[in-house]
Amino acid sequence: DEGLSPIRLADKPGFERWIQREPLGVVFVIAPWNYPYLTAVNAIMPAILAGNSVVLKHSAQTPLCSERFHQAFQAAGLPEGVFQYLHLSHKDTEDIVRDERVDYVAFTGSVSGGAMVEHAAAGRFIGVGLELGGKDPAYVRADADISHAVEVTMDGAFFNSGQSCCGIERIYVHKSVYDAYLQQAITWVKKLKLGRPDAQDTTLGPLVRTSAADFVRKQTQEAIDQGAIAHISADDFPLDRSGTPYLAPQLLSHVDHSMRVMTEESFGPVVGIQKVRSDQEAIDLMNDSEYGLTAAIFTSDIHRGVELGQQLETGTFFINR
């Protein structure tokens, strides 16, 4: 209730002033295939709790999620029509964004998809919320707990096979701890088990589709051709096969920002590790990106970590996680 209450403003002589919070109307939620329930819930529930109706368009990769939401809301007694879902093509989705009955659009997905939504909504003067991709960086300072940094950054890079908007996609390590970090990271990655997502011993599943794996393979090979060193052998991951969504993890060193793997969203199980000489070099490289979703710094000096974090061009900043 407090979150939906009017916002009181300072009184003026003869006036009482407040900002009244009211429902927008119809909220069109466009949800992605990765974390298909969580990302959708983050948009659906605030909209409904604030008194809006919701139309959900889920990814073609995860169509049953929409239907499960509908079943759950029916079982909960939500009034008919407050939540609806549509299975749509990209063209149909654009048409819904343009429809005058839609009062707000909440989109989670790729940068190209977000650009489509923004373009389709242009001139309608409605609110549009966009949560897009990232090339999220991490920096391991000289004073960091290396074992902890390896554990957290590797998990951040390979969790969900790297298919996370907030996944760690590039890592900068101070030269004084670079070798120790790299060796521990290699050991960590080699323990991953590539397998079917329904197998109990699998710790690294397939990508969402073959074309996604092909994209990461091409990006990785291009970096190797430019001088990057690959530290993981695909031979250790028998399910890795071209023409399938199964892709072995990869750690790349001797990388730089001339390589797409360090500047373009990968959304897969590959991460580049670059040596830096100073905090300033790390900050400059972390900010050398068109993205700005999350970033992390690993250090034992929390005060210094906060100082560095304030120099980062990012929406969310973490220390030691």
Which residue stretches match the model-derived regions?
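Long amphipathic alpha-helix in the N-terminal Rossmann-like dinucleotide-binding domain
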Residues: D1-G3
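Well-formed, non-transmembrane alpha-helical positions, independent of function
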Residues: P46, D95-I96, V152, E222, ...
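Residue-level recognition of oxygen-bearing side chains
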Residues: Q61, K91, R101, D145, ...
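Short glycine-enriched loop/turn motifs at secondary-structure junctions
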Residues: E80, D99, L132-G134, C165-C166, ...
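Rossmann-like NAD(P) dinucleotide-binding subdomain of oxidoreductase/dehydrogenase enzymes
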Residues: I7-H148, V276
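ALDH superfamily catalytic-core signature
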Residues: Y104, S112-D256, Q280, L285, ...
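Conserved C-terminal structural/oligomerization subdomain of aldehyde/semialdehyde dehydrogenase
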Residues: V102, K193, L239, Y246-R321
